[in-house]
Curated annotation (Swiss-Prot):
InterPro entries: Ribosomal_uL10 (IPR001790), Ribosomal_uL10-like_sf (IPR043141), Ribosomal_uL10_bac (IPR022973), Ribosomal_uL10_bac_type (IPR047865), Ribosomal_uL10_CS_bac (IPR002363). GO terms for biological process: translation. This is Large ribosomal subunit protein uL10. It comes from Ectopseudomonas mendocina (strain ymp) (Pseudomonas mendocina). Part of the ribosomal stalk of the 50S ribosomal subunit. The N-terminus interacts with L11 and the large rRNA to form the base of the stalk. The C-terminus forms an elongated spine to which L12 dimers bind in a sequential fashion forming a multimeric L10(L12)X complex. GO terms for cellular component: large ribosomal subunit. The keyword Protease does not apply.
Length: 166
């Protein structure tokens, strides 16, 4: 079924806005995935702050033109499902990676982050990025560990001086 020119322009504009706002993008082939599974993926994507859309390749190429995601143009072949992470760079990669575990036919093609192309085997790097809250928690544990070590060292010095004075 042919799409009207106005509809094509609207799709390109919508995807372009998502691309401009996106921190990272992941491209996948969802051939053979059931409608129920795709609905579940879209629901999880909304909750994770990820924009997910199936778009024709020619429209997708126009939509990402001039953005940091135009490095993905070569993988826009066949049915293309694209996801843009809006809140955390690893959200879309993590979402697709988890979804692919339960779907044999779901294939992650590639990703882009900060204008760099990531092949399908490099998705784990993007998916393993800690979220903002996880990063803060890691930083706080490092700071807490350092301060407790300092407190123990100062207590040991105090005990040594008290023992030497006695």
């Amino acid at each position: 079924m042919a799409i009207k020119l106005e509809d094509k322009k609207a799709i390109v504009a919508e995807v372009n806005e998502a691309a401009k706002a996106g921190l990272s993008a992941v491209v996948a082939d969802a051939r053979g995935v059931t409608v129920g599974a795709m609905t579940g993926l879209r629901k999880e994507a909304r909750e994770a702050g990820v924009y997910v859309k199936v778009v024709r390749n020619t429209l997708l190429k126009r939509a990402v033109e001039g953005t940091q995601f135009d490095v993905l143009n070569d993988v826009f072949k066949g049915p293309t499902l694209i996801a843009f992470s809006n809140e955390h760079p690893g959200a879309a990669a993590r979402l697709f990676k988890e979804f692919a575990k339960g779907q044999d036919k779901f294939e992650i093609k590639a990703a882009a982050f900060e204008g760099k192309y990531l092949a399908a085997n490099q998705i784990d790097v993007l998916a393993s990025l800690p979220t903002r809250d996880e990063g803060i928690a890691q930083l706080m544990s490092v700071i807490q560990g350092a301060t407790s070590k300092l407190a123990r060292t100062l207590a040991a010095i105090r005990d040594q001086k008290e023992a030497a004075a006695a």
